[in-house]
Regions:
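Mg2+-dependent prenyl diphosphate-binding active-site environment of isoprenoid biosynthetic enzymes
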Residues: 19, 29, 33-251
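N-terminal amphipathic/basic leader segments beginning at the initiator methionine
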Residues: 2-29
Length: 253
């Protein structure tokens, strides 16, 4: 990497967020991606070039900067987190039949299911490669949370059309599917700053709870927002019988 300065000349928090988002986008565009086979790498490039919010890598940067983490290691972790997030979105969109992601056709919609499976696998592999020279605990926690996300998706599918699901079960599911990655984002920034285990756990819990709030809000917007504003397909939760906070509140009235 060239000289990496992730602290802009501004006292505005919102300007700092935009600066980090731009730096993350630039770094994503520089990830080495082969041109062949196009069947694999064209959809991967398509996903990486998408205009996501970069919420998770930004959180990792903020956590790391607060704890004086090395900026090079922090950028690698942030990119790996964003690739893991996009891997999960590519597969989730296919499983749920969602046709729009980040304002453009989802991978399985633009190509097909087989392409989406392979592209997701490739994104996950690229994420792993970014972590190879970082401390072993970073690699371990990354993969522990990756498995937790898969568990959350498994619970999400199991809960479809099951009217016995409680709000506590729902909260457990979204803590795995959504909260865990935000928890990891906050935690890994702390770990790169060589903080103690108690602080690392607190950072994970902070991110986890942020993720729960984010998912509950997303459940609301899934029903009451507009697809153009959200940049993704909406209403599929109702069609598929997904268990959301609003749906469960209605069931348990």
């Amino acid at each position: 990497m060239d000289h990496l300065n992730l602290m802009p000349d501004t006292n505005s928090f919102s300007d700092h967020i935009e600066f980090l988002r731009d730096e993350i986008d630039k770094a994503l565009s520089k990830i080495p991606i082969n041109g062949s086979p196009k069947y694999l790498y064209d959809p991967i490039q398509y996903v990486i070039s998408g205009k996501g919010k970069r919420f998770r890598p930004i959180l990792a940067h903020l956590s790391g900067q607060a704890h004086n983490a090395d900026p090079y290691a922090l950028m690698k972790v942030s990119l790996a987190i964003e690739l893991l997030h996009n891997f999960s979105l590519v597969h989730d969109d296919m499983m749920d039949g969602d046709e729009i992601r980040h304002g453009k056709p989802s991978v399985h919609n633009k190509w097909d299911d087989s392409t989406a499976i392979l592209a997701g696998d490739g994104l996950f592999s690229l994420a792993q490669l970014l972590l190879t020279d970082l401390p072993q605990i970073i690699f371990q926690r990354f993969n522990e949370v990756a498995l937790t996300i898969c568990e959350g998706q498994g619970l999400d599918k199991e809960f479809e059309h099951d009217t016995s699901i409680s709000i506590n079960q729902y909260l457990s599911m979204i803590s795995k599917k959504t909260g865990a990655l935000l928890g990891l984002s906050a935690e890994l920034g702390s770990r790169l700053g060589n903080l103690d285990d108690h602080t690392n756990l607190n950072m994970y819990e902070f991110g986890l709870n942020l993720g729960l709030a984010f998912q509950i809000q997303d459940d609301y917007l899934e029903i009451f927002s507009a697809s153009a504003m959200m940049g993704k397909s909406l209403r599929s939760d109702i069609i598929l019988g997904k268990k959301t906070f609003l749906m469960l509140s209605l069931i348990h009235i």
